[in-house]
Curated annotation (Swiss-Prot):
This protein's name: Copper-transporting ATPase
GO CC list: plasma membrane
Ranges of the Extracellular topological domain: 105-124, 173-194, 367-379, 706-716
Gene3D superfamilies assigned: 3.30.70.100, Calcium-transporting ATPase, cytoplasmic domain N (3.40.1110.10), Calcium-transporting ATPase, cytoplasmic transduction domain A (2.70.150.10), HAD superfamily/HAD-like (3.40.50.1000)
Catalytic activity: Cu(2+)(in) + ATP + H2O = Cu(2+)(out) + ADP + phosphate + H(+)
Molecular-function annotations in GO: ATP binding; ATP hydrolysis activity; copper ion binding; P-type divalent copper transporter activity
Record flagged with keyword 4Fe-4S: no
Source taxonomy: Bacteria, Pseudomonadati, Campylobacterota, Epsilonproteobacteria, Campylobacterales
Residues binding Mg(2+): 631, 635
Intracellular or extracellular location(s): Cell membrane
Length: 745
């Protein structure tokens, strides 16, 4: 059984990986993925052995709060920005008290100059008050940090909580010594760390605020798409307009769409017209004109006139619902490259605590001064610095932020990745297999030429009247051509469709009722022929003389034209060193012509679904990493077999289950965009990981005091600043993906 839920209380990747590790050990858990940024979790478990309530109890024991849905955050009296501002103000106040006299004695009143026991004690008490206020604004670090430590799942908050608490306790002890006059020399006289506690918390809070703002911006961009779902719609029932819940709409319902409203479900216009903003699907800002017979999709915006539409999908199966599901999966899943960071994070925090304790003991022993309290002060500074400077967040954010921003960028390009692994794998593709009809071509054959043995208008009238009864794309092409030439309609009876061959009907022909047939050559037993040398889709029109003989009256030659810009985009793909293949069920001449025209390396014609499947198997057996690009319908087996499946979606025709990547642009450029975005994302992740590993590898030893003899020691305050800058640098580097652009050549 698969379930999705949310977990509150996580602060860094050590939290999320700790939950995964703890639950992953359970025999009834098959798979679990926890995402730190959007607080989501996906789990697959054996429902015969446990249930979701039991899993929630296990997570609660670890110190976190699992919930089926995320409750809206309660509005607090002080906003996060106000809290941060107050923390900064009181930190500056404490720093002023502790260091003002060092800059200039005139900066402090004489009563606070710490020149005697009384002024020292008064100054320290004011520092303590300011410190407690700053700690109050940063209390979440202590609540979450000590809770995680209690449950043996230490995280970044645990490091901050332990380090600053140790500094506070030491300062309180020094304050006691001053108050009781038990100090021994200048080193033990009022050696406080209140300013270190405040500065550490302030820098960490600033870093977290920048981190959260960046994360929220990326998540808000995604959630804005989800907000395109209207709650109600106007249903036409018994000639009355009734406002109904979108969830109650069923296929076939007639809905009225007013100007300035969102489309509730997928459907088809049956009366009126409109201009729709489909940017949430395609990324294109220009409105799209829609008329009777055109499809409209949920979540798109009707800007001007009102129209009537018939629902073709319910809310659950609508285009917007499928996009929301894909976004949720993409945000919640993890890329393979993140596994390394997770493995390191799982042992990182305990290792840092061990290193800090070891460094404390060593410095207590080897510190150069004979005085114990001076040595204790140096050892404590090293202990706090090691805890504070280590940055598990940078490791966790390295992949999560890049993938989050990349998915946001993809949606603006009309691309949706099924999960993080799809985003990661697209860059490795070295072979792309294209379907032809509807993928490389428009999927709407148009009449190229007409060959008639009877009067042309009569031939068009016969074909128009019969093909009007068919939904086939070829039939629509002939009907459109006949309309352009004002061909009249005839009355039809006894309409019969032979799937895959053609359609026949009885109609008036030269004053008598005749059976007229329209279809491919296999549909006829002709007693005469037509000499046609053109390549294209051949559709014959004839009269049935008897059951075994047909008289040909004429023929249409149609062609399915390549989409605009396809040739250039195929060339872009080939410039990446990728081999291209065209697999189509069309005849050899048409497929060959298309492949040559577009510059595709190889092709297979007359290909049935099994033939396409076998070709992809063959390519994979040769070690190729194959991307299949199709329409998601008759290509489903091939899409499932490929390493990366791309569906060129046409609204509700999209098959999310078969697709790794869905393009609502219905444009081959999106294939190139997906590959380039994948490359840029993985490069960005590697940059983040490199920085995170290098930072911790260099700065933790520095905090331990390895360069003491070179007079280089990091104070706890500087350590806090370095840790915050490390996380912020990873976040800001990930934001560079927002500026990702596709070059046209």
């Amino acid at each position: 059984m698969k379930e999705s839920f949310y977990i509150e209380g996580m602060t860094c990747t050590a939290c999320s990986s700790g939950i995964e590790r703890s639950l992953g050990r359970k025999s009834f858990v098959k798979k679990i993925e926890v995402n730190l940024l959007n607080k989501s979790a996906n789990i697959e478990f054996n429902e015969n052995e446990t249930n979701l309530d039991e899993i929630f109890k296990l997570i609660e024991k670890l110190g976190y709060s699992p919930k089926k849905t995320l409750a809206e955050e309660k509005k607090e009296f002080f906003s996060p920005n106000v809290k941060l501002a107050l923390a900064v103000i009181f930190t500056l106040f404490v720093v002023y008290l502790s260091m003002g006299a060092m800059l200039s004695p005139s900066l402090l009143p004489k009563s606070l100059l710490a020149i005697d026991n009384h002024s020292n004690f008064l100054n320290a008490c004011l520092q303590l008050i300011g410190t407690l206020i700053v700690m109050h604004w940063g209390r979440d670090f202590y609540i979450q940090g000590f809770k995680a430590l209690w449950h043996r799942q230490p995280n970044m908050s645990s490091l901050i909580a332990i380090g600053t608490s140790a500094a506070l306790i030491s300062s309180l002890w020094q304050l006691y010594l001053v108050y009781t006059d038990h100090y021994t020399d200048q080193w033990s006289y009022g050696h406080y760390y209140f300013e270190s506690v405040c500065v550490i918390l302030m820098f960490v809070m600033v870093g977290k605020r920048i981190e959260n703002v960046s994360k929220d911006k990326a998540l808000d961009a995604m959630q804005a798409l989800m907000k395109n779902a209207p709650k109600t719609a106007l249903k036409i029932q018994n000639d009355q307009q009734i406002e109904v819940l979108v969830d109650s709409i069923v296929v076939g319902d007639i809905l009225k769409v007013l100007p300035g409203t969102l489309i509730a479900v997928d459907g088809e216009i049956i009366e009126g017209e409109g201009e729709l903003d489909e940017s949430m699907l395609s990324g294109e800002a220009l409105p799209v004109y829609k008329k009777v017979g055109d499809k409209v999709f949920s979540g798109t915006f009707n800007s001007h006139t009102s129209f009537l539409m018939k629902a073709t999908q319910n809310n659950k199966n609508s285009t917007l619902s499928q996009i929301v599901e894909m976004i949720h999966n993409a945000q919640s899943s993890k890329a393979e490259i993140s596994r390394l960071a997770d493995k390191v994070s799982s042992v990182f925090v305990p290792s840092v605590i061990a290193i800090a304790i070891l460094a404390f003991v060593v410095w207590l022993i080897i510190a150069p001064k004979p005085d114990f309290w001076w040595n204790f002060g140096i050892a404590l500074e090293v202990f706090v610095s090691v805890l504070v400077i280590s940055c598990p967040c940078a490791l966790g954010l390295a992949t999560l932020m890049s993938i989050l921003v990349a998915n946001q960028k993809a949606s603006s390009l009309g691309l949706f990745f099924k999960d993080a692994k799809s985003l990661e794998k697209a860059r490795l593709v070295n072979t792309i297999v294209f379907d032809k009809t509807g993928t490389l071509t428009n999927g709407k054959p148009v009449v190229k030429s007409v060959h008639s043995k009877i009067e042309l208008l009569e031939l068009l009238s016969l074909a128009n009247s019969i093909e009007k009864s068919s939904e086939h794309v070829i039939a629509k092409g002939i009907v459109e051509y006949a309309k352009e030439h004002n061909a009249p309609l005839k009355e039809m009876s006894e309409v019969k469709v032979k799937t895959g061959f053609g359609i026949s009907a009885k109609t008036d022909y030269q004053g008598t009722k005749e059976i007229i047939k329209v279809g491919n050559s296999e549909f006829f037993n002709p007693i005469n022929t037509l000499e046609i040398q053109e390549n294209g889709i051949l559709v014959l029109v004839g009269r049935a003389i008897n059951e075994k003989e047909d008289e040909l009256l004429g023929a249409f030659v149609l062609e399915d034209l390549p989409k605009k810009g396809v040739k250039e985009h195929v060339a872009q793909i080939k410039n990446l060193g990728i081999n291209t293949f065209l697999l189509s069920g069309d005849n050899r001449e048409n497929v060959k012509k298309c492949a040559l025209e577009l510059g595709i390396d190889g092709y297979i014609s007359n290909a049935k679904p099994q033939d396409k499947l076998n070709k992809i198997k063959e390519l994979k057996e040769k070690g190729r990493i194959v991307m299949m690009v199709g329409d998601g319908l008759n290509d489903a087996p091939s899409l499932a077999m490929s390493d990366v499946a791309v569906v060129m979606a046409k609204g509700s025709d999209v098959s999310v289950q078969a697709a790794d990547i869905v393009s609502f642009n219905n444009d081959i450029k999106s294939v190139y965009s997906a590959i380039k975005l994948s490359q840029a994302t993985i490069k960005n992740i590697k940059e983040n990981l490199f920085w995170a590993f290098c930072y911790n590898s260099v700065f933790i030893p520095l905090a331990c005091g390895v360069l003491y003899k070179a007079n280089i020691m990091l104070s706890p305050a500087i350590a806090g600043l370095a840790m915050s800058l490390s996380s912020v640098s990873v976040v800001l580097n990930s934001q560079r993906l927002r500026n990702f652009k596709i070059k046209d050549h």
